[in-house]
Amino acid sequence: MPLSGEYAPSPLDWSREQADTYMKSGGTEGTQLQGKPVILLTTVGAKTGKLRKTPLMRVEHDGQYAIVASLGGAPKNPVWYHNVVKNPRVELQDGTVTGDYDAREVFGDEKAIWWQRAVAVWPDYASYQTKTDRQIPVFVLTPVRAGG
């Protein structure tokens, strides 16, 4: 079942504008950042309960997705990280296809595998990690089955 509730646009201009373009076009526009594919992640706000939409780099392998909470290597995790921790049911739009997923933070060997995949898609992730003392979180998304 798709997430429902009041939508609160991002306070960040670039994020809000890309999310708006993605949504208004039905996923036919706004699907790239610097020539690389992006997905649109919808989360439920940890504090507000409002829907938040965030464009993120598309990290996909054999039909499974991962999301990387890099925030460009900032000292703190992005706001959406806290939303996903509190409310792990998310919606992901990849182009014109939208689905519901359960997000699970990964660690150890599983994280290492997904980190390599993420860096292969967006090499800047590697430099982001060197800029921060925190370990950049990675979540793997599992599709929610009908009725789940």
From Swiss-Prot:
Protein name: F420H(2)-dependent quinone reductase Rv1558
NCBIfam families: hi_GC_TIGR00026
EC number: 1.1.98.-
InterPro entries (UniProt xref): F420H2_quin_Rdtase (IPR004378), Split_barrel_FMN-bd (IPR012349)
Organism: Mycobacterium tuberculosis (strain ATCC 25618 / H37Rv)
Keywords assigned by UniProt, alphabetized: Oxidoreductase
Functional description taken from the UniProt entry: Involved in a F420-dependent anti-oxidant mechanism that protects M.tuberculosis against oxidative stress and bactericidal agents. Catalyzes the F420H(2)-dependent two-electron reduction of quinones to dihydroquinones, thereby preventing the formation of cytotoxic semiquinones obtained by the one-electron reduction pathway.
Class of the enzyme per the UniProt entry, highest EC level: oxidoreductase
Note: Was identified as a high-confidence drug target.
